[in-house]
Amino acid sequence: MQLTIAFDAFFPVGRWGPLFHVLCLEQPLLTLEWRPVRFPTVGRSPLGDAEVGLLVEPLVGPGLDSLTIDSSPMVAIMAVGHPLARHDEISVADILDEQFLDVQDLDPRWGAIWTLDDRRGAPAKLIAPPVADGDAALRAIASGAAIGTAPEWAANGLHHPGVVSVALRDGPSVATRLVWRSNDDNPIVRALIDLAAAWATLRRDRADAGEPGAA
């Protein structure tokens, strides 16, 4: 038995390893095939040729179902020394006029989530030319040319010493979702969905109880 899993190549998603570890313990004959995926582009399925996806704010269209397994505050990512970085937290309004990242061929619907277009009521000012990938994005932020946003849990895993994260006191939540095809009756996929649902419920209960490590 084999299960192919797409995941965001540009986020530090190792925190979800225990979920798949338990799946393998419950399904000892199962092997996992991993598909790192780049930033979403127009016309590309979030899953590609994978059977399931573990994705941050996926663009789930017709023929796909999803389950939210985590919800995290959004934070702003900026260069060390940026005037706003002296604060422990800022408001969304503080960054709406900043220049944001742009990525080559990025699906504008996904980009609008991270540039907070719904709060601004208009598209953001974007860096030009667009960057090619996650490493180039971090270099652009570290240079002071742009700012970005990310889930709070991802901020400590950004591999560049020239960037810092600042909490957004009124920022949106960012969802991590398990995604699968609606017509997929593979029992392994269904087992993963059930396990992920139980995992998400347990994490929420622990967070509500204030237990350490539940976030």
Predicted segments with their positions:
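A late-sequence structural motif
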Residues: 14-18, 166-208, 212
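Secondary-structure junction motif
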Residues: 16, 85-88, 97-122, 186, ...
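Short beta-strand-centered segments that line the small-molecule binding cleft or hinge
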Residues: 18-22, 26, 40-78, 142, ...
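Hydrophobic hinge/microswitch elements
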Residues: 38-43, 104-164
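Beta-alpha-beta core module
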Residues: 29-30, 61-67, 72, 139-184
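Flexible hinge/capping segments at coil-to-helix
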Residues: 66-74, 78-100
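Short alpha-helix C-terminal cap/hinge motif
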Residues: 1-36, 44, 116-119
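Short helix-loop hinge/linker segments at domain boundaries
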Residues: 1-6, 62-65, 86-89, 118, ...
